[in-house]
Amino acid sequence: MSTIDVPAGFASSPFQRLLRLVTSQQKLWTVLKSAVQIFAIRILGAGLTYASMILLARWLGAHDFGIYAYVLVIVTLLGIAFSFGFNSSGVRFVASYLARNRLRRLSGFLRFSHKVVAALALLGALAGAGLVFALKDIIEPYYVAPMLVGLLCVPVWALLNQMEATARAFGLVNVAYVPGYILRPLLMIVFVGGLVTFGGTADAVTGLWALVGACTVAALGQGLVIWRRIRKPRSAARPAVHARHWFAVSLGFQIGRAHV
Protein backbone atom coordinates (compact mmCIF):
# COMPACT_ATOMS: atom_id res chain seq x y z
CA MET A 1 0.00 0.00 0.00
CA SER A 2 1.38 3.37 -0.94
CA THR A 3 2.38 5.85 1.71
CA ILE A 4 0.05 8.80 2.31
CA ASP A 5 1.71 12.20 2.45
CA VAL A 6 1.15 13.90 5.78
CA PRO A 7 1.10 17.71 6.00
CA ALA A 8 3.97 19.15 8.00
CA GLY A 9 1.61 20.56 10.58
CA PHE A 10 0.42 17.09 11.42
CA ALA A 11 3.86 15.61 12.13
CA SER A 12 3.93 13.45 15.27
CA SER A 13 0.26 14.21 15.79
CA PRO A 14 -2.68 11.90 16.51
CA PHE A 15 -3.67 12.41 12.87
CA GLN A 16 -0.37 10.93 11.71
CA ARG A 17 -0.67 7.98 14.08
CA LEU A 18 -4.17 7.33 12.75
CA LEU A 19 -2.87 7.34 9.19
CA ARG A 20 -0.15 4.87 10.11
CA LEU A 21 -2.78 2.58 11.59
CA VAL A 22 -5.01 2.83 8.54
CA THR A 23 -2.17 2.28 6.07
CA SER A 24 -1.02 -0.88 7.81
CA GLN A 25 -2.56 -3.63 5.69
CA GLN A 26 -2.68 -6.25 8.42
CA LYS A 27 -4.19 -3.91 10.99
CA LEU A 28 -6.62 -2.48 8.45
CA TRP A 29 -7.80 -5.97 7.52
CA THR A 30 -8.29 -6.83 11.19
CA VAL A 31 -10.27 -3.65 11.82
CA LEU A 32 -12.45 -4.16 8.73
CA LYS A 33 -13.06 -7.81 9.58
CA SER A 34 -14.09 -6.93 13.13
CA ALA A 35 -16.34 -4.13 11.89
CA VAL A 36 -18.11 -6.46 9.45
CA GLN A 37 -18.56 -9.09 12.15
CA ILE A 38 -19.99 -6.57 14.61
CA PHE A 39 -22.32 -5.14 11.96
CA ALA A 40 -23.57 -8.60 10.98
CA ILE A 41 -24.10 -9.66 14.59
CA ARG A 42 -25.98 -6.47 15.42
CA ILE A 43 -28.21 -6.76 12.35
CA LEU A 44 -29.01 -10.41 13.07
CA GLY A 45 -29.46 -9.60 16.76
CA ALA A 46 -31.87 -6.77 15.97
CA GLY A 47 -33.91 -9.13 13.81
CA LEU A 48 -33.99 -11.81 16.50
CA THR A 49 -34.92 -9.30 19.19
CA TYR A 50 -37.72 -7.89 17.02
CA ALA A 51 -39.00 -11.39 16.27
CA SER A 52 -38.84 -12.37 19.94
CA MET A 53 -40.85 -9.30 20.93
CA ILE A 54 -43.53 -10.06 18.33
CA LEU A 55 -43.77 -13.68 19.46
CA LEU A 56 -43.83 -12.71 23.14
CA ALA A 57 -46.62 -10.23 22.47
CA ARG A 58 -48.66 -13.00 20.86
CA TRP A 59 -47.86 -15.59 23.53
CA LEU A 60 -48.24 -13.35 26.59
CA GLY A 61 -51.13 -11.19 25.47
CA ALA A 62 -51.32 -7.40 25.46
CA HIS A 63 -51.63 -6.91 29.23
CA ASP A 64 -48.87 -9.31 30.30
CA PHE A 65 -46.57 -8.24 27.49
CA GLY A 66 -46.95 -4.64 28.65
CA ILE A 67 -45.89 -5.68 32.16
CA TYR A 68 -43.00 -7.71 30.76
CA ALA A 69 -41.78 -4.79 28.64
CA TYR A 70 -42.05 -2.38 31.58
CA VAL A 71 -39.99 -4.64 33.85
CA LEU A 72 -37.50 -5.33 31.04
CA VAL A 73 -36.80 -1.59 30.75
CA ILE A 74 -36.17 -1.42 34.51
CA VAL A 75 -33.84 -4.44 34.36
CA THR A 76 -31.92 -2.91 31.45
CA LEU A 77 -31.47 0.45 33.18
CA LEU A 78 -30.44 -1.14 36.48
CA GLY A 79 -28.03 -3.48 34.72
CA ILE A 80 -26.32 -0.49 33.13
CA ALA A 81 -26.40 1.56 36.34
CA PHE A 82 -24.91 -1.18 38.52
CA SER A 83 -22.05 -1.67 36.07
CA PHE A 84 -20.77 1.59 37.63
CA GLY A 85 -18.91 2.45 34.44
CA PHE A 86 -16.60 -0.58 34.64
CA ASN A 87 -18.01 -1.85 31.34
CA SER A 88 -16.74 1.38 29.72
CA SER A 89 -13.47 1.76 31.61
CA GLY A 90 -12.72 -1.94 31.17
CA VAL A 91 -12.05 -1.49 27.46
CA ARG A 92 -9.58 1.29 28.22
CA PHE A 93 -7.75 -0.37 31.12
CA VAL A 94 -7.50 -3.85 29.63
CA ALA A 95 -6.26 -2.58 26.26
CA SER A 96 -3.76 -0.27 27.96
CA TYR A 97 -2.38 -2.95 30.28
CA LEU A 98 -2.10 -5.43 27.40
CA ALA A 99 -0.25 -2.93 25.21
CA ARG A 100 2.25 -2.15 27.99
CA ASN A 101 2.48 -5.78 29.18
CA ARG A 102 1.40 -4.88 32.71
CA LEU A 103 0.02 -8.31 33.48
CA ARG A 104 -0.23 -7.82 37.24
CA ARG A 105 -2.47 -4.79 36.81
CA LEU A 106 -4.40 -6.54 34.06
CA SER A 107 -5.04 -9.57 36.25
CA GLY A 108 -6.01 -7.34 39.15
CA PHE A 109 -8.46 -5.31 37.11
CA LEU A 110 -10.10 -8.37 35.56
CA ARG A 111 -10.73 -9.95 38.96
CA PHE A 112 -11.64 -6.72 40.72
CA SER A 113 -14.02 -5.34 38.09
CA HIS A 114 -16.07 -8.51 37.68
CA LYS A 115 -16.31 -9.13 41.43
CA VAL A 116 -17.28 -5.52 42.15
CA VAL A 117 -19.92 -5.41 39.42
CA ALA A 118 -21.43 -8.72 40.55
CA ALA A 119 -21.45 -7.71 44.23
CA LEU A 120 -22.86 -4.21 43.70
CA ALA A 121 -25.50 -5.44 41.26
CA LEU A 122 -26.54 -8.16 43.72
CA LEU A 123 -26.80 -5.64 46.55
CA GLY A 124 -28.76 -3.31 44.28
CA ALA A 125 -31.16 -6.10 43.33
CA LEU A 126 -31.69 -7.00 46.99
CA ALA A 127 -32.32 -3.35 47.82
CA GLY A 128 -34.78 -3.16 44.93
CA ALA A 129 -36.60 -6.26 46.17
CA GLY A 130 -36.81 -4.73 49.63
CA LEU A 131 -38.24 -1.55 48.13
CA VAL A 132 -40.85 -3.53 46.19
CA PHE A 133 -41.92 -5.33 49.37
CA ALA A 134 -42.05 -2.04 51.27
CA LEU A 135 -44.24 -0.45 48.60
CA LYS A 136 -46.36 -3.47 47.76
CA ASP A 137 -49.46 -1.75 49.12
CA ILE A 138 -48.89 1.13 46.70
CA ILE A 139 -47.71 -0.81 43.63
CA GLU A 140 -50.38 -2.49 41.55
CA PRO A 141 -50.53 -6.18 42.62
CA TYR A 142 -49.89 -7.51 39.12
CA TYR A 143 -46.51 -5.71 39.04
CA VAL A 144 -45.10 -7.14 42.29
CA ALA A 145 -44.20 -10.69 41.23
CA PRO A 146 -42.84 -9.69 37.78
CA MET A 147 -40.65 -6.99 39.33
CA LEU A 148 -39.23 -9.41 41.91
CA VAL A 149 -38.42 -11.96 39.20
CA GLY A 150 -36.96 -9.24 36.99
CA LEU A 151 -34.66 -8.08 39.78
CA LEU A 152 -33.10 -11.56 39.82
CA CYS A 153 -31.84 -10.80 36.33
CA VAL A 154 -30.08 -7.53 37.24
CA PRO A 155 -26.76 -9.02 38.51
CA VAL A 156 -26.55 -11.34 35.50
CA TRP A 157 -27.35 -8.46 33.13
CA ALA A 158 -24.63 -6.30 34.69
CA LEU A 159 -22.11 -9.14 34.41
CA LEU A 160 -23.03 -9.65 30.75
CA ASN A 161 -22.26 -5.98 30.12
CA GLN A 162 -18.93 -6.30 31.91
CA MET A 163 -17.91 -9.49 30.13
CA GLU A 164 -18.83 -7.92 26.79
CA ALA A 165 -16.39 -5.09 27.54
CA THR A 166 -13.68 -7.57 28.56
CA ALA A 167 -14.09 -9.60 25.39
CA ARG A 168 -14.03 -6.44 23.26
CA ALA A 169 -10.80 -5.30 24.91
CA PHE A 170 -9.16 -8.63 24.05
CA GLY A 171 -10.41 -8.43 20.47
CA LEU A 172 -12.84 -11.34 20.90
CA VAL A 173 -15.62 -9.88 18.76
CA ASN A 174 -17.83 -12.96 18.51
CA VAL A 175 -17.46 -13.74 22.21
CA ALA A 176 -18.34 -10.15 23.07
CA TYR A 177 -21.50 -9.75 21.00
CA VAL A 178 -23.01 -13.16 20.21
CA PRO A 179 -24.21 -14.03 23.77
CA GLY A 180 -26.11 -10.77 24.29
CA TYR A 181 -27.31 -10.04 20.77
CA ILE A 182 -27.92 -13.54 19.37
CA LEU A 183 -28.07 -16.16 22.10
CA ARG A 184 -30.23 -14.27 24.60
CA PRO A 185 -33.20 -13.48 22.28
CA LEU A 186 -32.91 -16.91 20.66
CA LEU A 187 -33.15 -18.62 24.05
CA MET A 188 -36.13 -16.43 24.93
CA ILE A 189 -37.96 -17.73 21.87
CA VAL A 190 -37.00 -21.33 22.67
CA PHE A 191 -37.97 -21.16 26.35
CA VAL A 192 -41.32 -19.39 26.03
CA GLY A 193 -42.17 -21.06 22.72
CA GLY A 194 -41.43 -24.47 24.21
CA LEU A 195 -43.66 -23.72 27.19
CA VAL A 196 -46.56 -22.70 24.95
CA THR A 197 -46.02 -25.61 22.55
CA PHE A 198 -46.25 -28.17 25.34
CA GLY A 199 -49.45 -26.71 26.75
CA GLY A 200 -48.11 -24.31 29.36
CA THR A 201 -49.52 -20.88 30.09
CA ALA A 202 -47.28 -17.93 29.34
CA ASP A 203 -47.65 -14.70 31.29
CA ALA A 204 -45.42 -11.84 32.40
CA VAL A 205 -43.86 -13.87 35.23
CA THR A 206 -43.00 -16.86 33.04
CA GLY A 207 -41.64 -14.49 30.39
CA LEU A 208 -39.34 -12.91 32.95
CA TRP A 209 -38.26 -16.31 34.27
CA ALA A 210 -37.35 -17.14 30.67
CA LEU A 211 -35.34 -13.90 30.56
CA VAL A 212 -33.49 -14.88 33.74
CA GLY A 213 -32.74 -18.31 32.28
CA ALA A 214 -31.63 -16.92 28.91
CA CYS A 215 -29.32 -14.36 30.51
CA THR A 216 -27.86 -16.95 32.88
CA VAL A 217 -27.08 -19.43 30.11
CA ALA A 218 -25.59 -16.66 27.96
CA ALA A 219 -23.48 -15.37 30.86
CA LEU A 220 -22.19 -18.83 31.80
CA GLY A 221 -21.21 -19.61 28.23
CA GLN A 222 -19.60 -16.23 27.68
CA GLY A 223 -17.73 -16.33 30.97
CA LEU A 224 -16.38 -19.83 30.33
CA VAL A 225 -15.07 -18.91 26.88
CA ILE A 226 -13.53 -15.63 28.04
CA TRP A 227 -11.81 -17.16 31.05
CA ARG A 228 -10.30 -19.91 28.90
CA ARG A 229 -9.11 -17.47 26.23
CA ILE A 230 -7.46 -15.08 28.71
CA ARG A 231 -5.98 -17.72 31.00
CA LYS A 232 -2.41 -16.38 30.79
CA PRO A 233 -3.02 -12.74 31.89
CA ARG A 234 -5.68 -13.83 34.37
CA SER A 235 -3.29 -16.21 36.12
CA ALA A 236 -0.48 -13.67 36.55
CA ALA A 237 1.08 -13.86 40.02
CA ARG A 238 0.09 -11.38 42.74
CA PRO A 239 -2.50 -9.23 40.95
CA ALA A 240 -2.00 -5.51 41.50
CA VAL A 241 -5.11 -3.65 42.64
CA HIS A 242 -5.63 0.10 42.18
CA ALA A 243 -9.21 0.25 43.40
CA ARG A 244 -9.42 4.00 43.97
CA HIS A 245 -8.11 4.86 40.52
CA TRP A 246 -10.31 2.30 38.79
CA PHE A 247 -13.40 3.47 40.65
CA ALA A 248 -12.68 7.14 39.90
CA VAL A 249 -12.26 6.57 36.17
CA SER A 250 -15.22 4.18 35.95
CA LEU A 251 -17.57 6.53 37.77
CA GLY A 252 -16.44 9.30 35.43
CA PHE A 253 -17.55 7.18 32.48
CA GLN A 254 -20.83 6.41 34.23
CA ILE A 255 -21.57 10.05 34.99
CA GLY A 256 -20.77 11.00 31.41
CA ARG A 257 -23.10 8.32 30.10
CA ALA A 258 -25.89 9.39 32.47
CA HIS A 259 -25.48 12.99 31.33
CA VAL A 260 -25.80 12.00 27.69
Feature map (PLM): residue ranges:
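Transmembrane-helix boundary and interhelical linker motifs in polytopic inner-membrane proteins
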Residues: 26-29, 60-62, 79-115, 168-175
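Interfacial/gating helices of multi-pass transporter permease domains
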Residues: 56-77, 144, 204-209, 242-256
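Hydrophobic alpha-helical transmembrane segments
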Residues: 148, 178-230
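Short membrane-interface helical motifs at transmembrane helix boundaries
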Residues: 94, 123-141
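Alpha-helical transmembrane segments of multi-pass membrane proteins
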Residues: 138-163, 212, 216, 251-253
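Small-residue-rich midsections of specific transmembrane alpha-helices
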Residues: 10, 48-52, 69-98, 117, ...
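Membrane-interface junctions at transmembrane-helix termini in multi-pass inner-membrane proteins
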Residues: 156-182
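N-terminal membrane topogenesis motif
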Residues: 1-48, 111, 239-256
